[in-house]
């Protein structure tokens, strides 16, 4: 049964990636007073599959200076890690009563006790595929793009880790299912306490996924396409799929940490008749729209501004705010372990 769930999750992520690309092109076209994809299929709905077939049919060009196995291993590693992060994301849940106790049964492949640490570890491992791609391509542009991307991801992982720590402190658990349940039962003052961390997490999401306005690794005027400049055909497609799968993954993490997961946004009885999976997907969709909105409206940062924001603003602020949250929880005797 778990194998069926894994296959269904992989297929769902790949289809979601395909139509996220379609959504991005349509929304950006609307904001720029254009039509966007509208030829292949009704309203252009088959355009993602047309693009996939085009990439499959292209020749895989191997640069003369590339470094053999590493050149082909890099996109596979990046794509595999982008899918692996989804194993611990609870997409919904069913509540059952056993011996008079309400038990939450999440829709998740692996409900790990250390789910937060697992997601952080997967996001950290992704830098290996990127630096390998830049080194193995044998191109200075690709290598510089890879160095930029890796330094950017490492810089913002620090603040993201502190944000996740603050939410875990409030929830008293590192399991993502427990965090969603605890966040749903939290008082409003605790939501306000975590609100600045939500802002830090959203901006860090943009930097972690190399998305606009922090897409410095692929600055066209400087580095052409960045670390994947020498890739073509399905090798390029794997990097492309990995990037968009990561966009959906970090959006799902923000839904789990800050937006109540599969619970409805308002505690109104009639809203609970809508399946939790629908609420979860709706919240992820809203965050993905924000990704596209930012890309269409915000100018690109300079590299020094990006690094200054990560190391001199977000990291100190996140550290101080974790201390503030810990102090407040200590004052109200709500730190993990104090309730007993």
From Swiss-Prot:
Residues in the signal sequence: none
Coiled coil (UniProt feature): none
Membrane-crossing segments per the record: 3-23, 69-89, 102-122, 127-147, 154-174, 186-206, 248-268, 274-294, 312-332
Predominant location: membrane
GO molecular function annotation: NADH dehydrogenase activity; oxidoreductase activity, acting on NAD(P)H, quinone or similar compound as acceptor; quinone binding
Membrane topology value: Multi-pass membrane protein
Catalytic activity: a quinone + NADH + 5 H(+)(in) = a quinol + NAD(+) + 4 H(+)(out)
Alphabetically ordered keywords of this record: Cell inner membrane, Cell membrane, Membrane, NAD, Quinone, Translocase, Transmembrane, Transmembrane helix, Ubiquinone
Assembly with partners or alone: NDH-1 is composed of 14 different subunits. Subunits NuoA, H, J, K, L, M, N constitute the membrane sector of the complex.
Family: Belongs to the complex I subunit 1 family.
This protein's name: NADH-quinone oxidoreductase subunit H
Protein source organism: Anaplasma phagocytophilum (strain HZ)
Gene designation: nuoH
